[in-house]
Amino acid sequence: MELGNYTVIDTILESKVRILSSLFGGCDGDHDVRCRHDLSLAARADVYSSLVLFLRGRFRRSVRPPRQPGNNIDVYLRPLVEELLQLWHEEGVPVWDEHEQKEFNLRGLLFVTINDWPALSNISGQSNKGYNACTHCLGETDSMYLGNKNVYLGHRRFLPRQHVVRMGGGKHFRGEADNRTKPTRPTGDVMYDMVKDLKVIFGKGPGGQSVPNDSAGHVPMWKKMSIFWELPYWKILEVHSSIDVMHVTKNLCVNLLNFLGVYGKTKDTPDARQDQQRMHERDNLNPEKYQGPASYALTKEEKEIFFEVLSSIKVPSGFSSNIKGIINMTEKKFQNLKSHDCHVIMTQLLPIALRGLLPENVRVPIVKLCVFLNAISQKVIDQESLTRLQKDVVQCLVSFELVFPPSFFNIMTHLLVHLVDEIAILGPVFLHNMFPFERFMGVLKKYVHNRARPEGSISKGYGTEEVIEFCVAPP
């Protein structure tokens, strides 16, 4: 509607359409804009142009950043695979062995991939959620759906066949025996037969094609055939993607501290109690009008002792972050936990702080688990002790099944049972976890001084440091 020298806009929606449409051209600067309800859109032509420029800048800043490729990572890995194929050829590169005093052919291979849990699924092509989320058990994963999540139980089958708990002795597990055999990890040839016929078209557009769910609506075990299967030696490797102990320890620490009631919101909820009621397990924890405290939850007095012990601990410089900075003495809870903080808590501090606290059937398995994590984190591991370590961690998980509700047993808790097998194949944990890569990423981030050009800043900073090291190095 025209009113003198102004154009009156009837609705706010129309005003938004007029202004936003000018972002894509067609802006008419000869008219002034005035809203009938005296909004701030009333302006002369110069102010209107400034508003349009301001909205253009806001619109550009609101554009979503590039998303992670997810399962389409194979498209970006194509150049890497081509270089790996060049490193692995029949004749190899002749290299002189000074010790043997003879020449041999040198070839390079990709020994194992190291990723966190979501990236492991994208790289390997195996699903990391649902009923078959375990990368070792595959189709033999013991899982059930409770409380809107999958839980992974059945760790008794990893015990020796004649173990009293497995045979159903005593009152545990309702006296039922578990005669199942321990799942065996399939060989590379068997895994290749599982994925060789999968047809996947990469891309998130209309042309993309993924592996559909099964007849029951469950997530498929394999989402794609990984590009690394093109490598001729990939079938021979016993472990393709290692379990990242750093993230497993952090998730386990947070999960355990949540149930102890000293970090975040407690997971001892009525829904968790109802899961046990559905399974007919531990009737003493069934929900009532008054939800009684669980045996694994610290009381108010125990929390006082627990955090007083932690606040009094003094560690050497560089051993860990400031312990007083990660605990809140007022609320009696942990705060701002990082991966290394969880590593120090689980391997060193938690067994000390829990001495004399909690019932023995709860405290002893937790302490044994901390001892296990400390043992596998050493740089030197005796191969003869691996059998004992495997036995200890299985007994800890079985003891946890007798104490904690099913919601405690997420996939990260279940992966503990497979760590010793990977150590026997790949070596000590420090050789195949994420700590070295996270530290190096921290070094690269310090090179970024221009946030608009992070790649250029990293390249320039890394090159400058390399030149300085070359110049100051002794001849």
PLM feature spans:
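A short acidic (Asp/Glu
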Residues: S40-R44, I73, S121-I123, K445
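A cross-family structural signal marking well-folded subdomains
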Residues: L350-L354, N361-V362, I366, C370, ...
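Active-site beta-loop-alpha junctions of metal-dependent nucleic acid enzymes
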Residues: V63-P79
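Domain-level detector for long, ordered catalytic/regulatory cores in large eukaryotic signaling
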Residues: M1-V8, L13-K16, F24, R78, ...
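Acidic, metal-ligating active-site segments
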Residues: V8-T11, I19-P66, H136-G139, F470
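Conserved, folded interaction/cargo-binding domains in eukaryotic regulatory proteins
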Residues: P365-C370, L415, V429, M434
